[in-house]
């Protein structure tokens, strides 16, 4: 019998509250979005699939995305409440004011 053993860890929940009306969108991440083969949940993502912490992000990545497994991710575009503390823990950085300004339909708590 063949099998593959894989270690799985849990990740922090980026959504603080699930309201039921969130606008999610699938997006293919650019190769530059990955650091060490992973793009961390909570990263602000631009329309071209790159991490964009300053200019024009269109959403927040909901879960970690692994380049080797599947370079596609899901972003929250609007009508959601995210946990800023969990984003900072996941990405290693606080959410920039420019990101909050660019995403007015997402509440950062």
Where are the regions a protein language model picked out?
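Surface-exposed, low-hydrophobicity beta-strand/loop segments enriched in small/polar/acidic residues
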Residues: 1-109
């Amino acid at each position: 019998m063949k099998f593959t053993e894989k270690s799985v860890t849990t990740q922090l929940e980026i959504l603080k509250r699930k309201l039921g009306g969130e606008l999610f969108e699938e997006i293919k991440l650019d190769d530059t979005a990955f650091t060490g083969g992973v793009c961390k949940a909570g990263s602000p993502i631009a329309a071209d699939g790159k991490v964009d912490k300053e200019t024009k992000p269109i959403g927040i990545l909901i879960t970690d995305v692994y380049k080797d497994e599947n370079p596609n991710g899901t972003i929250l575009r609007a009508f959601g409440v995210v946990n800023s503390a969990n984003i900072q823990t996941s990405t290693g950085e606080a959410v920039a004011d420019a990101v909050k300004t660019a995403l007015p339909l997402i509440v950062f708590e």
